[in-house]
Structures are given as C-alpha cells and as structure tokens.
C-alpha cells in the first residue's frame, strides 16, 4: 500500500490526519516526508501512520561522519565546535576518552584543566601536563570524532562513516570495526580503500560491497562461486574475482 507518492505523474498522501493538508503550499525546498510530518497531526492508532512516524524517527537519528572532513550529521544534532571542549562537558569525559583510546592501542593519561582560557584536555607526561590538542595525530583526531558519536550512540539509529580509516593502520581499522560490530541496535556502513580489512574472519562476504560508477554491489553477487569461510576474500578481490 502506498501512503505517500511523489513522482512525475502523481503527488498524494494517504495517511489518516493528512486529509486536509494543502500540497499547493509545498514548494519542494524540503522533502515531502518532512513537510507532511511538520504540518499534520497523524492518527497514532493507525498502522500506516505508525510506520510512517517510525520511519521519520529512524531518519532523524541517522548520522554521517567523515574522517577526512569535519563532523557532520543528518537529523541528529551532534556536538560541534571545539572537540576537546565538548568532551570536557561530558560526564567523565576525559576518563571515557582515555579508555576509548586505550582500546584502540593508544595510551594517554588525560585530565581536564582550566588554566585561564577555558576547560580543555591535558596529557600527563611524567611530571608535566601538556595540552592534548597539539599531540593528536590525524588518526587520533579521527578517533576523537568517532568517540563523540560513540558517547551519543543510544540516540543514533544509523551511522555512515566515510573513509573511516583514512588515517588508521590496519590493526586499528580492525579494532574500530569490531567496536562497531558490538553495537547491536545500530546499523553501520563505512567506506574504505584499505583492502587489508577484507576478510571472512571480520565480516561475511555479503557485508562487503564495491562502489564503482555510482553502482553498489555485494561481493556475493559479483561471483558465481559459493563463497565459504575458508576463502581468502582479499586474495580473490585482488585477483579480480569480484570485478565483472
């Protein structure tokens, strides 16, 4: 059953509570879904309306992250501005970040200090405390981005991480993937150019996709072979087994 249609031939809504909505006022500057959601009081007892509202709720909790650009989001408001200041305002922020980085194999002793210019994070190095920001490599900064999302993960439905391991070595990439796999109630999609993470031990063949010429296809649809756990997916990929 179609409850909302917007194409060349027709544009209509079939939801209880939207019968009197005037589509002449919709100028296309926002999606039709968002327009309906913002301008109607739908019947929450109607199953079609329930599905529509659940869909909107899911989309509003989608997040897009990029390791090579600034932190951005779709629907969900994630903290912006100075990363370390934001973490300082989290409960046990420095301790949580330290533990998160240790899981990734990075050992820092982090503390929050305010030395006259606002709160920020310092790193203990022997008897000295030095600002953490100048110590962060590109990879560490990328992990801090990821940490900010991770602390908000209970409010997120779907996360897309573009070039998630652009600044990671392979072991760190695998550690991050395993961290994400442990989250059962979030769908995660990430992109990478690192073929060293193509492994049956990490993900099933139907979880690996090739994106090329605006077409995305899973490995399992790109070969006639029955892919088994013993297969070396990376070796097959490099040999061209998944290129039509």
Region locations from a protein language model:
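Electropositive, glycine-dotted interaction segments
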Residues: 1-109
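Short polybasic amphipathic segments
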Residues: 1-3, 10-13, 117-126, 207-210
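Short, solvent-exposed loop/turn motifs
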Residues: 9, 20, 128-131, 215-216
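A short, sequence-level motif marking secondary-structure junctions
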Residues: 18, 133-139, 220-226
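Short glycine/proline-enriched coil/turn segments at helix->beta-strand junctions
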Residues: 106, 153-156, 183-187
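C-terminal lobe/lid and adjacent interdomain/linker elements of RecA-like ASCE P-loop ATPase modules
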Residues: 114, 175-244
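Conserved ABC ATPase signature
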Residues: 115-151, 155-158, 163-168
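Short alpha-helix of the ABC ATPase nucleotide-binding domain corresponding to the H-loop/switch region
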Residues: 169-174
């Amino acid at each position: 059953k179609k409850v909302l249609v917007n194409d060349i031939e027709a544009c209509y809504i079939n939801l209880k509570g939207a019968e009197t909505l005037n589509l002449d006022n919709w100028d296309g500057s926002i999606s039709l879904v968002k327009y309906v959601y913002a301008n109607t009081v739908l019947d929450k007892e109607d199953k079609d309306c329930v599905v529509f509202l659940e869909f909107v709720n899911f989309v509003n909790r989608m997040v897009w992250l990029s390791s090579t650009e600034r932190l951005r989001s779709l629907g969900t408001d994630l903290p912006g501005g100075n990363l370390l200041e934001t973490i300082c305002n989290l409960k046990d922020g420095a301790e949580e970040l330290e533990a998160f980085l240790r899981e990734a194999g990075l050992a820092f002793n982090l503390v929050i200090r305010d030395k006259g210019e606002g709160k920020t994070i310092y790193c203990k190095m022997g008897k000295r405390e030095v600002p953490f920001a100048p110590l962060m490599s590109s990879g560490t900064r990328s992990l801090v981005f990821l940490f900010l999302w991770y602390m908000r993960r209970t409010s997120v439905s779907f996360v897309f991480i573009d070039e998630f391991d652009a600044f990671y070595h392979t072991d760190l990439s695998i550690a991050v993937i395993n961290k994400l796999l442990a989250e059962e109630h979030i769908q995660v999609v990430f992109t990478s150019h690192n073929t060293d993470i193509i492994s049956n031990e990490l993900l099933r063949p139907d979880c690996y996709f090739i994106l090329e010429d605006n077409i995305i296809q899973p490995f399992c649809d790109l070969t006639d072979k029955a892919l088994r756990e013993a297969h070396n997916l990376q070796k097959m990929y490099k040999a061209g087994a998944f290129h039509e």
